[in-house]
């Protein structure tokens, strides 16, 4: 299946990607990466497997267009990554946890889109601010109940010694 496929995406200190079936017959000016086999693979996240250097993973579209996080049926990547310090990893933990509040807020706001549009159309700034305050309070309360993201000791050891892509 993969014989003669090209590594069509190479990003220094991050990953190399292959598996586009169109790359088998592509000329040297072809844009690659869009080929597929007509199916995806359901998301499978196993905590003991993470994006350390050398990890093999199935490629997928971003969460914004792929909320189920399904993987490509044919494309894959190998993590090349780079090394990170413990303080960099600690900062990433903080950023990831802070971003979670925004994600929760946005999820809640999407449920109120009709209401938001009506208030915008009516120039109801007081109503918009009240709804924003309410959603921020709800997002914060929901966030406080969630388990916070934290790198495991194994992840810290790998990312500080051999490297990887901890942001994935």
Range-by-range predicted roles:
Residues 1-168:
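Cyclophilin-like peptidyl-prolyl cis-trans isomerases
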């Amino acid at each position: 299946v993969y014989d003669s496929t090209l590594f069509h995406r190479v990003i220094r200190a991050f990953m190399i990607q292959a598996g586009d079936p169109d790359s088998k017959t592509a000329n040297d000016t072809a844009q690659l990466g869009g080929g597929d086999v007509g199916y995806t693979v359901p998301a499978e996240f196993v905590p003991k497997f993470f994006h350390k250097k050398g990890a093999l993973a199935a490629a997928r579209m971003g969460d914004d267009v792929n909320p189920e996080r399904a993987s490509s049926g044919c494309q894959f990547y190998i993590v090349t990554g780079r090394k990170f310090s413990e303080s960099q990893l600690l900062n990433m933990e903080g950023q990831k946890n802070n971003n979670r509040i925004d994600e929760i807020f946005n999820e809640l706001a999407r449920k109120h889109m009709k209401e938001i549009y009506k208030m915008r159309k009516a120039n109801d700034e007081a109503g918009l601010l009240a709804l924003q305050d309410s959603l921020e309070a709800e997002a914060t309360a929901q966030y406080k109940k969630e388990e916070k993201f934290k790198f495991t000791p194994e992840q810290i050891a790998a990312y500080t010694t051999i490297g990887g892509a901890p942001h994935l």
